[in-house]
Amino acid sequence: MIDIKLLQKDFDYVVKALQKKGVDNALLNNLKDLALKTKQKRQEMEDVTAEQNLLSKEFGRYKKENLDISELQEKINALKTKKQELEDEVRTLEDDLNSIILSVPNMPDENVPFGVDENENVILEVIGEKPTFNFTPKEHWDLSCDWLDFERGVKLAKSRFTAIKGDGARLERALINYMLDFNRQRGFNEWYVPFMANSNTLQGTGQLPKFADDLFKIEGEDLYLIPTAEVSLTNLYNDEIIDKSELPLLLTSYTPCFRKEAGSAGRDTRGLIRQHQFDKVEMVAITSQEQSDEIFEKMVNCASDLLSSLGLCHQKVQLCSGDLGFSAAVTIDLEVWLPGQNKFREISSISNTRDFQARRAKIRYKEDKKNILAHTLNGSSLAVGRTLLAIMENYQQADGSVKIPEVLKKYL
């Protein structure tokens, strides 16, 4: 959640920042009017309180000097009534303001390149070498290794569900274990978390209320299937105050993820790229405000090194302002080379949300007896299904079989 105090203090600065993310001007103008009205009513309430305090002192003097207090009492009673009315108005305005603010995205960092969409993202570097083949490489769904059963996945559920079998299922499990071990070796503490979350939890990380249509809700319950372990890991510290000496908190977890993929009709309808259910190993960090840039770099490097350890060529991409996610202030995507598709595709997205999620989730740390909003960061390390298909395409053989990266053999 953006800082209401900053919004009221320097609205033009906030507007300029949010316009870089393509936020609708009508929403911003409504927000401005509501913020101004709330500020004015709050000032009226403070003025009434100040006047009450003065009259209370007068009341004490009148009583002490045995003066007639009837007229003064009427004024005090009138102010009490007015203050109650103003408190009710301010409460309603603040509820309305908070309702809108919960749907307003985070402001991008000032050094994030301006752009409208993914076409204006900036490639920072390419890491590793693309494999060469003496045959035309196939896309993963056309390989004859027979690991993916799309038809039975659809039969069991619906489109965008896949059953994985045999060596493919074993490789999926091996990748999960390898990714968790890799993250643990770099200082991340492993957690096993619920695969469901309540609405307060999802509001804390920014999925609700704005993205309710992309979530699978449990009918009759205040529970949703999680779209990412970021939700669970970040909210482990929801409404908590952490001693600064404990920071940074580096967390990792494997979970299945569930997304309706609303708005993705017609996109990536074949293969494992875009599924309603997929496995992912997640990294989350909770840091002090001065630590977050260093930890952001650590997380980007962790995911990149993981791809390199698997022998997968990939590129680092700086997202422009218009392609940033709702909660992100800055994001680096890692895109893996898929020779069958002859292009790079996203496999990890690492974001620093600054204090945006922490303000929503009330995650704070104590420093010099003061409670300070933490910074929260998150990133995939990695999306398991996309890593599986990347291995299938990069390690495919002419006969349709797939070699296994050396580092995974001990996990199989």
Curated annotation (Swiss-Prot):
InterPro entries: aa-tRNA-synt_IIb, aa-tRNA-synth_II, aa-tRNA-synth_II/BPL/LPL, Ser-tRNA-ligase_type_1, Ser-tRNA-synth_1_N, SerRS_1_N_sf, SerRS_core, tRNA-bd_arm. ATP binds at R259, K260, E261, E346, I347, S348, S349. The keyword Cytoplasm applies. SUPFAM superfamilies: Class II aaRS and biotin synthetases, tRNA-binding arm. It comes from the Bacteria. The keyword Transcription does not apply. Its EC number is 6.1.1.11. It catalyses: tRNA(Ser) + L-serine + ATP = L-seryl-tRNA(Ser) + AMP + diphosphate + H(+); tRNA(Sec) + L-serine + ATP = L-seryl-tRNA(Sec) + AMP + diphosphate + H(+). L-serine binds at T228, A229, E230, E282, S380. Keywords: Aminoacyl-tRNA synthetase, ATP-binding, Cytoplasm, Ligase, Nucleotide-binding, Protein biosynthesis. GO terms for molecular function: ATP binding; serine-tRNA ligase activity. Signal peptide: none annotated. Belongs to the class-II aminoacyl-tRNA synthetase family. Type-1 seryl-tRNA synthetase subfamily. Consists of two distinct domains, a catalytic core and a N-terminal extension that is involved in tRNA binding. This is Serine--tRNA ligase.
